[in-house]
Amino acid sequence: MDLGKRMRMKRVVDRSGVSIICALDHGMTAPRFLEPLADIRTRTAEAVAGGANVIMMSKGMIRTAEPAFGPDTSLALLLSASANPGRDRPEVVQVAQLEEASRLGADAVVLFTALSGDTEAGMVRTLAAVGEACERLGMPFIAEAEFPTTYATVEELEQQYGFEYLRRNVRLCAELGADIVKTNWPGDPESFGKLVEAANGIPVVLAGGSRLEDKELLWRMQVAVEAGAIGCSVGRNIFMHASPEAITRALSRVIRERWSSDKAHEALVEELGS
């Protein structure tokens, strides 16, 4: 890892060895517009106030959201968008380049990786090209090794694609140059541990996925960290929450401060009720 990548990784993964990513990129991937994202600057400010050290978003939205970034907040620029996102297997299209990420001050780039059908070969080529460019230009690469669509429940996705889909995707991303792998909750702690093992030492963060009860979200994060994850990448469960700042703070307490999920949930309930 060269000097530029090491310097950027120190910001993406903080001094405590943790990465708490708030994903505000759903305007590029969702099958419909999600109303809370209409005010991207406020959502950014809330996540930063709650303890997120990385904000994931598009090249268009950073121009609006930048004033809400703190001095230690990293930008992770999403390089891809989803074509036909309402389908079971949307097509991933690269819509930004590493040169743009560097010009915008990003500390990392992100690529959604969907292995499905006729588009899989092109996806693998794109993944490899981004991995090579990131190594050459010193840019950390966050690869999203996820189910082809994340707008369904874990149970539905597991039934449709299976655990081995996720494990193969995680390993492929690690093989082709990812510096951090983001992946879905596979349904149980033991299976998540196997995903961490498949990454073979490449840091793993757990995706938040579809909307969950707060207690379930915090529990998943606790067991993910216990299984070896270095953090989370959460979107809808933050920006669609009644208090994005409070739920981000609860996530930070579980991941960064190693509170139990029960203790963090109790504090969250108290904060929301005050």
Description of each model-found segment:
Residues G187-D188, S210-D214, I238-M240:
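Short Gly/Pro-enriched loop/turn and capping motifs at secondary-structure junctions
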Residues M1-H26:
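N-terminal basic, low-complexity leaders that serve as flexible interaction/assembly modules and, when applicable
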Residues S19-N84, R89-V204, K215-I230, R253, ...:
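Alpha/beta enzyme core
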Residues V225-G228, F239-S274:
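C-terminal helical cap(s) of enzyme catalytic domains, especially alpha/beta-barrels
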Residues V12-R15, P31, A65, H241-A242:
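Surface-exposed loop/turn and secondary-structure junction residues enriched for glycine/proline
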